[in-house]
Amino acid sequence: MPGILDRVLRIGEGKILRKLNKLKDQINSIEDDFVDLSDAELRALTDEYKQRLKDGEELDDLLPEAFATVREAAKRTLGQRHFDVQLMGGAALHFGNIAEMKTGEGKTLTATLPVYLNALTGKGVHVVTVNDYLARRDAETMGRIYRFLGMEVGVISPEMSPAARRKAYQADITYGTNNEFGFDYLRDNMARSLDNCVQRGHHYAIVDEVDSILIDEARTPLIISGPAEQNSRWYVEFAKIAPRLRRDVDYEVDEKKRTVGITEAGVAKVEDWLGIDNLYESVNTPLISFLHNAIKAKELYRRDRDYIVKDGEVLIVDEFTGRILRGRRYNEGMHQAIEAKEKVKIKEENQTLAKITLQNYFRLYEKLAGMTGTAVTEAAEFQQTYNLGVVPIPTNKPMIREDLRDLVYKTEEAKFQAIVEDIAECHERGQPVLVGTTSVEKSELLSKMLKRRGIPHEVLNAKNHAREAAIVARAGKLGAVTVATNMAGRGTDIMLGGNPDFIAAEELQERGLSPLETPEEYEKAWPEALERAKKEVEAEHQKVVELGGLYVLGTERHESRRIDNQLRGRAGRQGDPGKSRFYLSLGDDLMRLFNGERVQMIMNRLNLPDDQPIEHKMVTKAIQSAQGQLEQQNFEIRKNVLKYDEVLNRQRQVIYAERRKVLEGADLREQVRSMIDDVLDSYVRSATAEGDPEDWDLEHLWTAFSQIFPVSFTADQLIEENGGDISVLTPDIISQRVREDAHEVYDRREAEIGEETMREVERQVILQVMDRKWREHLYEMDYLQEGIGLRAMAQRNPLIEYQREGYDMFQEMLEGIKEESIRFLFNVEVRVNQPQESQITAASAAATASAIPLVAPEAEKTEDKAEDAQEAEESAASAEAAESAKDTAQDKDAESVAKKAQAVVPALGKEEKQPEKLQYSGPSEGGGVEKRTEDTGPDYANTPRNAPCPCGSGKKYKKCHGAPKSRV
């Protein structure tokens, strides 16, 4: 199917390119009209375009003028004019396609065209980058164009407060990483107040390095988790057992799939050592996960490759970028197993609170587009999964880079010796070299060898990535030798002789100028700084060109051809010369796992010495075959992830939509009344499903009713109301009567405490119940998915079984939300203090064990009474009102909700306590899994004085953490 679809997609490319070419000519034809405009006139066009949109004009109609406007603004701010091919790329992005543009063709500048055009709608545009550095850099650099045209620009970064995030999303254009956008979406759907939501919809997004984000990283879901109960002693116990087990005897390892399997012999040994009869008895099944993780930690996770141990802590190293992922942890107890293996302190495990895959997050956008240098090979997957077409954009200048054949050595030692010799030759003649490695370990090994040879070089890996952009920007200078993990520093152009834009920006930064903090001074100083930088690199650029340009040297093939091509693409940008070559050994992971035996056999037959490489078409084909197998395997994994997540995605859409209704308070009273009816009807249906009325257990049914609300009549009274004959009773009669009674009780409660207070109580209660039930459901769905594969042994389709059981569990959860919410709403005690205050008290009026008690916040009991009285006096309209408010303040347990609608319901039981720290797990920049732990401490700094305090006490901020005594 993908093959046929690929051919169909390619047939349409010519038609799209003709359309883009026509638009390009149209933009060029009006360029002079914009050159003659003053800065003020150019800026005024933004308001004109917005008005034309309001008057009914379409975005497509504005495209030529808007693009010409941005082109002229870029010339005046950055000194850069969009090439014709960039105009074509920008149009492709506007129409919701993926623009395939080779490295160095200016994707970042290209994106400014459709970003500006779509930002005119006022709905917000999201620009998605692969890391925080690029998000900040692009927001600053490209932001100069947008700000010149009167647009606001925001950037999202992990350390930002909710208020700062909200402000960034309110901007016309928002830059950030895929993980940050996704996590904000999940957090918004965990928020207890609209004030805590930061995003304002999903209108249009442009994803940079779209193949990396939407394909390579798609199989790793975004997960927000909190601490869960665990027994850490089992990690230690199994860390002792794993070394005693023998590979291929007691267990088997599949390195391709990164899985392990215990054999019968291994099971027998483990049972003997643990003193248990059967490892697979239900009481012992949790131990299987500990065992598997311990073996994985032993066989699949290597120190200094996958992680490092520093200061008694296990820190993950990104497999592809080589960065240390501080605060990130592996899932499913894997990190704890590694900690036990390394004999460091074992940190707590986490429970999933919210979860979504990148595939489903990006499908939320009304319009989606992307940019990359390598997308055509994945065109079918982009079309099937995201409904995105791929448009290959021509290069501005012909590509003349020379890609040399791979050299394969018998041993890794011989390979690295040959690499050092090659680097030494290039360095001696002054040709710059960029060396790509696959791990921190390999980059440090090569660095030591280069030092021994006396070759000066820069190392770019997890231990010095703070300088990576500066190092990469200078990697094209004469004699430069840069050793970098494969993906490090991407997004920064390696220009022969040096990067003048980077040099100019660095100079202004040293002078204390910033495009954000001092925009006017920065713009005034920029032209001169850029001119100086261009003169500095001009002569050196020519010398490097004469030497053959940048030489990219790969020390190992990656599992994806796309990553290899991205590394190669560092050389030969914008028509410059360059060359690339990969050095391999039979010990490389890719060669060892796929087809390495064939190459080994040939080398043995030829009796080649270790330092003699083999260079042949067959080797290239074998490598391509290996990479193809891995790519296909990963594609199947992504498809499988999507199929299973689609089940959860539909459930998530339903629960998030219902949650949003509650959060907004729309028709909340009617929602609660509907819940009451549904729960009571369910009770009646269950009790009257079988037999005649004489057989129904009405006493048991009334007991169930009384656990929900104080029912005011008995079953006997209902029979009397219907002529004293039980046989005339029907389920409808019972339902109708009990509903009316429940509505009357609820209406009385509302009249007692006030409509506004009741709505706030309803909102907080339902949200807390809904969130807890959803968390429990996520846990149960994870547990279901873990074991669903075993259904295949019973000749059942695991996916269909997962869909069926997942649906049943979801329906059960929805019923549970309704029942628990109304039970709480009927039984919570609300005390009304007349005339000024209404509060939710600490007590629960529930008569049954099933009612959920409320616990008053301790902060309220220790409130400074004098401060409360003073605040009450300030807000009183008269002396009498002030005296009344002072009396109220002396005995208050919570903030007024009747006047301000700011009631905050305390946690529904111990388990509802919000965790102090949340953990964020998502795909890393290079396709691995990365985690960070974030303190969920309240955002006090940006809280208005009269808003509820973020600590959750239920009091106003000015009377809680905003009080003078609390301001430190």
From Swiss-Prot:
One of its GO terms (biological process) is intracellular protein transmembrane transport. Residues 858-968 are annotated as: Disordered. May bind 1 zinc ion per subunit. Zn(2+) binds at C949, C951, C960, H961. It catalyses: ATP + H2O + cellular proteinSide 1 = ADP + phosphate + cellular proteinSide 2. It is found in: Cell membrane; Cytoplasm. It is an enzyme of class 7 (translocase). Its main location: membrane. SMART domains: SecA_DEAD, SecA_PP_bind. Residues 858-868, 883-898 have a biased composition (Basic and acidic residues). InterPro entries: Helicase_ATP-bd, Helicase_C-like, P-loop_NTPase, SEC_C_motif, SecA, SecA_CS, SecA_DEAD, SecA_motor_DEAD. Its cofactor is Zn(2+). Monomer and homodimer. Part of the essential Sec protein translocation apparatus which comprises SecA, SecYEG and auxiliary proteins SecDF. Other proteins may also be involved. Belongs to the SecA family. This is Protein translocase subunit SecA 1. It comes from Thermobifida fusca (strain YX).
